[in-house]
Regions:
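Sequence/fold signature of self-assembling virion shell proteins
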Residues: 1-5, 121-139, 166-276
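Short acidic, glycine/tyrosine-flanked loop/strand segments centered on an H-E-D-like triad
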Residues: 50-77
Length: 276
């Protein structure tokens, strides 16, 4: 249940951080090698080439929230085991984590709909169209972004973006896939070499019209790290004999917590499509 709302981190490079190893995780982003155009001298080894790598670091941070449930409410509510509160907190945890990932994805490469050069020039007709998808895929290919193992890039949109995409005549709905058992969470369909999932929230910029962000990215474009021992979890705490902050057992608590980090590894491999 706590995982229900997590759409945006799909496709991330995931690396857990063991306890006792500090708060910083390092990833390496390798630069493409020059192409070989000449054969070596017969019978000899080629010259060794140097790998060029950039270290990308991210720091794990704590995130948490909780609510108090009065003893009177817990004794008189129709839902005595607080299932409703647990569900609400679980959804909030998932949506909060999703938002943190989405905000980090905003650090990718911008593509303004309708070939506009300023966000203020985006009009209501500049939607997240099939043509925008084609342009994003072209950019990713030029940047040598890696596709996922299924041969597709991954797209992440919102209700504003999906409305335009699903009206295109070349759109393929997810339920028509031959391999329909291997869907992403929230998958809608695919278009021009991109499989799309939909989240309920969107990064919005208020301008001449409201402008929303959708994303298309390749494999290894961003990373997510969880601290072992403090992964995302919902906690239910009942009054206890040793609880000094609750001396007369007047409340219980329901909350969630996690230690987590997300980081864009290569902004050239994430296209942030800004559209109406």
């Amino acid at each position: 249940m706590v995982q229900r709302s997590q759409i945006m981190e799909q496709g991330a490079q995931k690396r857990p951080l063991p306890t006792g190893n500090g708060k910083v995780v390092y990833f390496q982003r390798y630069s493409p090698l020059a192409l070989i155009s000449q054969s070596p001298t017969e019978g000899s080894n080629p010259d060794a080439v140097d790998l060029s790598a950039t270290n990308v670091s991210c720091t794990v941070a704590e995130y948490a929230s909780y609510t108090k449930i009065s003893k009177l409410l817990s004794l008189t509510a129709i839902d005595p085991k607080m299932k409703g509160a647990v569900e609400v907190m679980g959804i909030n945890a998932g949506e909060s984590r999703d938002a943190l990932v989405r905000l980090e994805l905003d650090n990718g490469t911008e593509q303004l709909a309708g070939s506009k050069t300023l966000i203020s020039n985006i009009a209501s007709s500049d939607t997240f169209s099939a043509n925008e998808v084609r342009k994003a895929v072209k950019t990713l290919k030029i940047q040598k972004a890696m596709k996922y193992d299924d041969g597709y890039f991954l797209g992440k949109t919102n209700p504003y973006g999906s409305y335009a995409l699903m009206g295109d005549s070349t759109w393929v709905n997810a339920h028509t896939y031959k391999d329909g058992d291997n869907l992403y969470k929230g998958e809608l369909g695919r278009l021009h070499g991109v499989r799309f999932v939909e989240g309920s929230e969107a990064t919005k910029t208020s301008s001449t019209v409201d402008v929303y962000n959708s994303y298309i990215h390749g494999k290894e474009a961003f990373a997510v790290t969880d601290l072992e021992g403090d992964r995302q979890h919902v906690y239910v705490k009942n009054p206890g004999a040793n609880s000094t902050d609750n001396p007369v057992d007047r409340f219980s608590t329901v909350g969630w917590a996690m230690s987590f980090a997300v980081k864009v590894l290569d902004p050239n491999w994430i296209i942030v499509c800004k559209h109406a």
